[in-house]
Amino acid sequence: MSLAIVLSRAQVGVEAPAVTVECHLANGLPALTLVGLPEGAVRESKDRVRSAILNSGLEYPARRITLNLAPADLPKDGGRFDLAIALGLLAASGQLPAHALQDVECLGELALSGAIRPIQGVLPAALAARAEGHTLIVPAANAEEACLASGLRVIAVNHLLELVAHFNGRAPIVPYESSGLLHLSKPYPDLSEVQGQTAAKRALLVAAAGAHNLLFSGPPGTGKTLLASRLPGLLPPLDEHEALEVAAIQSVASQSPLTSWPQRPFRQPHHSASGAALVGGGSRPQPGEITLAHHGVLFLDELPEFDRKVLEVLREPLESGHIVIARARDRVRFPARFQLVAAMNPCPCGYLGEPSGRCRCSTEQIQRYRNKLSGPLLDRIDLHLTVAREATALNPTPQTGDDTASAAALVAQARERQQRRQGCANAFLDLPGLRKHCSLSSADENWLETACERLTLSLRAAHRLLKVARTLADLEQVDAIGRSHLAEALQYRPSSN
């Protein structure tokens, strides 16, 4: 048979669209033509594949070869198609049965010796292959990652000759079984390790219970970073769908091995990070920090030290839960449903309001420092809290109920109420959901309107205040939002926006 078809997968963002590798052998002078919009790395595949076939002791067809990677309008890059191209050549030249390649997808880069090297982005391809009911052939180094897609039949290989023997029936390969090495979770740091800061811990609990964004402001050394790092431990465990989304993003970003499966991510980029590092980008779009924090926590320490233009790009994903990166030929959509936790000092030196009087910043310096944060960005942060310095002990005794397990139990109860009532966390309520689930009595509504006018709160800030009040009521396991919930939620708003 002079025509063979092999199935493979490309990588576009966190998606893995299907690619059909068609190999045709014709009479004529020996040559190889590769079509289907291949990038440079794919065009180089023909040399790698030829050397791999010859060095494996197999016959490279001395005929006119045409390779088509369909669909032609899908950009293709990397060495992930090497294995599919090699199998297509061998099947078209009769060295292995072409019918054996039906319902089988192949991924892998070939070394010149015929060894099969690992690639990135295997998990999205594994999930897509599982949805199609296909078997997936991957490099042995990627097999454990592919097995995260439970129910998928995975064939793990180290060398091209193993596959030839497998398809010819001489040495069938047993489907790979996961060893479970990637299912080990690291313990979260405990909330009881944070001394004092009762108000800040309360705000952290509220943020976890409703998936609210949070901003800590205070002098250095008051525990802002310590508090933020405890938030992932308070959040409910990821379900299988969420865990696979997180793992797929890490796979695409080469964050392997996936030793954190199935934990929520905690990302802490440096304040010198560029816009592309934060939201993603590049000539070949790659996920940024906001995507790597999907279903987890994005912690921005020293918030005003970030470039203002970088911070402003957070506004859209904070509302929509995704980011779209457009290039000349590509338009890639990355998920970005993260929980923002930020920390900042009250002034450039950090000691404004300290009893010691150490602050020497002028009014102009303080105003210029705070003006780095725009009103629309601050509007999108639900909880604003000043973390004051407290007296500390060298060996503090943890308080009863002041630990991660106790707080996480309260969060789980509140989240369960929200899922039963509206199917999402309170922070993600849309306007119709807000009207339906955050209704107030006439007296409380008038009281809230007066408070919003005095504090000059925007309509968006008022809506976020209502969502926080809804979360406070859920923590108390009550259905109606009361005046006490509104009053506490109001305390978490800055005095001006």
Residue spans of the language-model regions?
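Walker B catalytic acidic pair
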Residues: 295, 301-302, 313
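P-loop NTPase nucleotide-binding/switch module
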Residues: 171-206, 210, 240-290
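The Walker A (P-loop) glycine that initiates the GxxxxGKT/S ATP-binding motif of P-loop NTPases
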Residues: 218, 280, 302
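Basic, amphipathic alpha-helical bundle interface domains used for macromolecular binding and assembly
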Residues: 35-46, 61, 68-78, 285, ...
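Residues immediately C-terminal
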Residues: 112, 298-299, 305-306, 392
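Peripheral, non-AAA+ core regions of ATP-driven protein-machinery
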Residues: 1-215, 219-225, 326, 462, ...
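Walker A/P-loop
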Residues: 215-258, 320
